[in-house]
Amino acid sequence: MNKTITPSIETIERNWFLVDAKDKTLGRLSTEIAAVLRGKNKPTFTPHLDTGDFVIVVNAEKVEVTGKKASQKLYRRHSGRPGGMKVEKFESLQERIPERIIEQAVKGMLPHNSLGRQQFKKLKVYKGSDHPHAAQNPVLLNS
C-alpha cells in the first residue's frame, strides 16, 4: 500500500528565483510566478501547506500588456470613505508605481485566504534591475 508523505515545515526547502519582467506579457508572467509561490513546481506540493519558493521580480516598469489594455485597463482602489473610489489606468500606474501592477496580478492568482497571504509575502518586486537579495543567490527562472 502506498503512503502519502506530508512534508513538515522543517523539511520544506525554500529556493530564491529571479525573474526579469522586461518585455514579458503581464498575465503569462504572473501565472508562472504564482505557480512558483504556491510550490506547484515541486513534487512535494501540498495544497494546504506553504511549500513555495521566494520570487524576485526586476524591471517591473517594462512589463507589457497586449492589445489596447495599456490605455483601457483600469485599477480601482477605495479609501473606505464615502466617495473614496480612485480609478487609474494601466499607463499612469506603470509610471507611478509599476510594482503594484505585478503584485495585484499575482495576488489575484493566489488563494484568497490566510495561506495565500502567507505565500504573497514571498514575492519581492522591484522597478529597476537592482535588488537587495544578492546574498540569497537567486537562480534565474526559465520563463
Curated annotation (Swiss-Prot):
SUPFAM superfamilies: Ribosomal protein L13. GO terms for biological process: negative regulation of translation; translation. InterPro entries: Ribosomal_uL13 (IPR005822), Ribosomal_uL13_bac-type (IPR005823), Ribosomal_uL13_CS (IPR023563), Ribosomal_uL13_sf (IPR036899). It comes from the Bacteria. One of its GO terms (cellular component) is cytosolic large ribosomal subunit. Keywords: Ribonucleoprotein, Ribosomal protein. CDD domains: Ribosomal_L13 (cd00392). PROSITE patterns: RIBOSOMAL_L13. GO terms for molecular function: mRNA binding; structural constituent of ribosome. It holds the Pfam family Ribosomal_L13. Belongs to the universal ribosomal protein uL13 family. Part of the 50S ribosomal subunit. This protein is one of the early assembly proteins of the 50S ribosomal subunit, although it is not seen to bind rRNA by itself. It is important during the early stages of 50S assembly. This is Large ribosomal subunit protein uL13. The lineage of its organism: Bacteria, Bacillati, Cyanobacteriota, Cyanophyceae, Synechococcales.
